Amino acid sequence: SAMPTVGPVTLGQDLFWRLLSGQQVLPIQRGCDLYTRNFLDYWNLRAVDALETGRNAFTTGNTDWASPLWCTNGQSVAKVLSSLSLSSALSEDPAESADSTQEGDTPAVPTVPALLPQQTDGHLPDADAAGAVQAAVQFPSGSTTRFAYDTDTGTYGMLHNDGSPQLDANTSIQAAFDNLLVLYSASTPRDDGRTLDYDLTMGGGLWLNGGHLWHITWTQGTGSTFAFYDADGRPLRILSGRSYIAWLSSLTGEEVTVQDSAGNDLLQP
């Protein structure tokens, strides 16, 4: 019920459900492709789907029925869970449950691992570049999301491609993030010739925080869904805060640019 308004809700993608399987996610989507359908069926998962629940769990924004922008929130989703035979309660880890029973302890409260390895203070490696105040991520659809660093707030404000602020629908103020994470993954075409499959075991990436830039490597973690390493291969815990994560593949021409205040490209050697 704490989930804020999110959207537009679009096609479900098995990439995200696979990546976040350890988080016990509740898929929320508006339809899906065959690969996602097969994944959900294989693992006996059911999504809250706008094509099934319609306006019982989703709103369509200020558009007419011919071109709705489907959005939802935690309260709206919670209202339809019982009718879909779904629950938002966390499942108990079988191994932990067995250990508690054997030791005679009170059963542990189910938890999920953190998504990101974070810290509130502690050592950080030297940044690979300073003055990282402008960033742009180009996605395969041709759309570009931009960010500008605000030294007063220490956050990266989100911008539309034309430079206008991207407003948070819940607060009506510009969306802003403490951390920008751009993660790269090797990708290969699937047999339908249109969609891509991704390597979810490891890849490279960038971390921006406080106007600084680090080159990182990511893998699947144990204490958290992701594990990060700095340019020297040492474990890295990013600073706690609101984080934006962009996922870029290796085949579709997606790209990221990071610039200083003078417009110099910080990713060029």
Positions of predicted regions on the chain:
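A surface/extracellular/periplasmic glyco- and lipid-processing/surface-interacting theme
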Residues: 2-269
